[in-house]
Regions:
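Conserved glycine-rich beta-strand-loop-beta hairpin in the small C-terminal domain of fold type I
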Residues: 362-373, 381-395
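Hydrophobic multi-pass inner-membrane translocation pores used for secretion
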Residues: 271, 277-283, 306, 322, ...
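N-terminal basic, amphipathic alpha-helical segments
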Residues: 1-130, 331-337, 349, 359-367, ...
């Protein structure tokens, strides 16, 4: 297909099946052509009036279809110049993050981003007014972690970590730990589905991901045991509110995974890296394999979802030697996380009003999860009960669901970027049973009201295919 050509209405009708002339079906047919390569990036689509006349529908019908495609990120409007098939996402984003990047087009309800509800975050104003007299900004020699924050972190840590440091967010912690643990060509056990930036990071580091399947309690011990036979150097997992499934480990599951690692052969140097990204908004208790494997576990606690993504702050705890290696390497870069930010976080962690705000946020997210999840299940969608702000929703067809929801003014995240290599390949090749079927991620934490109406749209998209299977 030659990109950048003008596709007239006659050509589009030859390529597509517009026997169902509803906005949703028309959008689905054009989506199929884009994803199949029949329409290329930069191709100019027929005008609304031209295609409406050719098909025999009203211009409003085509306009609604075009709007749905734009919301799904497949086409873009350039004003009087017309509507065009979108090009590739910016190269500044890694491959799977490009797959998750949402277009800038406004939608009625954006459930794609996996971010906390801003209205549930503690106010920073009072903390800022209090810390101005306490924060230290004039020293290169002070301790990298302010002592008061170190004590608060240690008192609440889920295991007896030998050392704890503060870094610039959970992904910074994961990246710095992996850089100390893995070498090019090493194997790393990952969850599938899992967090797309982890998979991008492993690709950048030249490692080989070994996917492990999940259930409602996280990694399955028998699947982990099979993965360990490939002699990985690290296991990367999310103990609570797993992104995207919302699964949280029970203490029994954590112990079973730890015993599985203990029993495995030829993995004596294996390191477990835990990303507790939801932290204080998770309804489940803090849990770590470090309770049973203290010398082999690095535990990360993020404060982004509980206290604000722009604070860019997380804590990292584990064996002293490894933490000191990470801290030493960091001194050759940023050195430390701003002590001003650390002081703000400390204030938020001990202030009664901020504590109550986070407690209420945790309750609200639990209520939103339960309300929307129950509504979906009552409508025939087999959504597994989840923790945190995300829900992994099974659908008959990923692209079809995205287009249908876009037509309803709702944006969700496509499921494919969350799959590790072999599972993603299976999904792309249509081997849905082996890959576990099609899914989309829904940020239910953003559903403040009208859960039944949202559930109606989600369930319809999950249980129906538009024309052509898209």
């Amino acid at each position: 297909v030659v990109s950048g050509i003008r596709v007239d209405a006659e050509r589009l009708i030859d390529l597509a099946d517009f026997s169902d002339a509803s906005p949703r079906a028309i959008a689905g047919e054009v989506a199929r052509l884009v994803n199949g390569g029949d329409l290329g990036a930069g191709d100019r689509l027929p005008t609304v009036r031209e295609l409406a006349a050719a098909i025999g529908v009203s211009p409003a019908t085509i306009s609604q279809a075009w709007q749905a495609l734009a919301r799904a990120g497949l086409i873009e409007s350039r004003g009087r110049a017309g509507s065009f098939v979108r090009g590739a996402a910016s190269a500044r984003l890694a491959p799977r993050m490009r797959g998750m990047a949402a277009p800038d087009d406004p939608v009625r309800l954006d459930l794609s981003r996996g971010t906390p509800d801003p209205l549930l975050l503690p106010a920073l104003g009072p903390a800022l007014s209090r810390v101005s007299a306490k924060a230290e900004t004039g020293s290169y020699q002070a301790e990298p972690v302010i002592p008061q924050l170190a004590r608060v972190l240690r008192d609440s840590w889920p295991s007896d970590a030998e050392a704890i440091m503060v870094v610039d967010g959970a992904l910074d912690a994961i990246s710095r730990t992996l850089e100390q643990v893995v070498r090019f060509g090493d194997r790393v056990v990952v969850e599938s589905p899992g967090f797309p930036p982890f998979l991008d990071l492993l690709e950048v580091l030249g490692t080989v991901p070994v996917p492990v399947r999940l259930d409602e309690h996280g990694m399955r011990p028998e699947s982990l045991a099979a993965a360990l036979r490939k002699r990985p150097v690290a296991v990367l997992l999310q103990p609570r509110a797993q992104n995207p499934t919302g699964a949280s480990m029970t203490p029994a599951r954590a112990e079973a995974l730890a015993r599985t690692i203990e029993a495995a052969e030829r993995v004596d140097d294996l390191v477990v890296i835990e990303d507790d990204h939801s932290g204080l908004i998770s309804i489940e208790g803090d849990v770590t394999l470090g309770t049973w494997l203290p010398d082999r576990v690095v535990h990360v606690r993020s404060f982004s979802k509980s206290h604000g993504p722009d604070l860019r702050i997380a804590a990292l705890g584990g064996p002293r030697d490894l933490i000191e290696h990470i801290a030493g390497r960091r001194m050759l870069g940023p050195g430390w996380t701003s002590r001003m930010l650390q002081t703000i976080l400390l204030d938020l962690l001990v202030d009664g009003t901020a504590i109550n705000t986070v407690t209420e946020a945790r309750r609200q997210y639990y209520t939103r999860q339960r309300t929307l999840g129950d509504a979906l299940r009552s409508r025939g969608v087999a959504a597994v009960p989840a923790d945190g702000i995300n829900l992994w929703m099974p659908v008959l067809g990923e692209r079809s669901a995205l287009v249908q929801l876009a037509a309803a003014g709702i944006r969700v995240a496509a499921g494919t970027p969350f799959l590790a290599a072999s599972d993603a390949t299976d999904a792309a090749n249509g081997m849905r049973q082996r890959a576990g079927g099609d899914f989309v991620r829904v940020t239910v934490g953003a559903v403040r009201a009208a859960a039944d109406e949202v559930a109606d749209d989600l369930a319809s998209a999950a249980t129906h295919l538009v024309a052509g299977g898209y």
